[in-house]
């Protein structure tokens, strides 16, 4: 895996993503440039794996991540899927290869979708 780029290289003066956001595994485009806001929020994401293994919610292994792209409308995504509900959370996965979670969505907040910078690549 390539080293993560510094947020300053990825974030525009307006706080938006300068580059396209891609799946690390298959390269599928998740977000177009300029469509998400940089956000620092501490969120726990389970370890990366295929979608069926994510929806059972039984494995607590994962990472506490702080740097995310915040998307306020699910229709802004180019290529993202959602797991079944795990409590009041849906995890975001790549719609092509189904690896994830690359992000997180709380069902209590209809307008906040977080994509972890460490779980995606940029071009």
UniProtKB/Swiss-Prot annotation:
The UniProt keyword set, sorted, is: Acetylation, Guanine-nucleotide releasing factor, Metal-binding, Protein transport, Transport, Zinc
Q: In which tissues is it expressed?
A: Ubiquitous.
- Record's GO cellular component terms: cytosol; membrane
Residue ranges constituting the MSS4 domain according to the UniProt record: 9-123
Q: Which GO terms describe its biological process?
A: membrane fusion; post-Golgi vesicle-mediated transport; protein transport; small GTPase-mediated signal transduction
Q: Which SUPFAM superfamilies match?
A: Mss4-like (SSF51316)
Q: PROSITE patterns of this UniProt entry?
A: MSS4
- MF (Gene Ontology): guanyl-nucleotide exchange factor activity; zinc ion binding
Keyword Acetylation: yes or no? yes
Q: Which residues carry this modification: N-acetylmethionine?
A: 1
Output the InterPro entries linked to this UniProt entry: Mss4 (IPR007515), Mss4-like_sf (IPR011057), Mss4/transl-control_tumour (IPR011323)
Provide an example Pfam family for this protein.
Answer: Mss4
Q: Which positions, given as ranges, span the membrane? A: none
Protein residues bound to Zn(2+): 23, 26, 94, 97
| Role noted for this protein | Guanine-nucleotide-releasing protein that acts on members of the SEC4/YPT1/RAB subfamily. Stimulates GDP release from both YPT1, RAB3A and RAB10, but is less active on these proteins than on the SEC4 protein. Might play a general role in vesicular transport.
- Stated family: Belongs to the DSS4/MSS4 family.
Subunit structure and binding partners: Interacts with RAB8A.
Protein name per Swiss-Prot or TrEMBL: Guanine nucleotide exchange factor MSS4
């Amino acid at each position: 895996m390539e080293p993560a780029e510094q947020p300053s290289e990825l974030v525009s003066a307006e706080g938006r993503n300068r580059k396209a956001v891609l799946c690390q595994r298959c390269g599928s485009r998740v977000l177009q440039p300029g469509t998400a806001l940089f956000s620092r929020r501490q969120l726990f994401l389970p370890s990366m794996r295929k979608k069926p293994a994510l929806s059972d919610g039984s494995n607590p292994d994962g990472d506490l991540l702080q740097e995310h792209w915040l998307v306020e409308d699910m229709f802004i995504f180019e290529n993202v899927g959602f797991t079944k509900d795990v409590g009041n959370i849906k995890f975001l996965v790549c719609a092509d290869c189904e690896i994830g979670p690359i992000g997180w969505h709380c069902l209590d907040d209809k307008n906040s979708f977080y994509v972890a910078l460490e779980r995606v690549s940029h071009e």
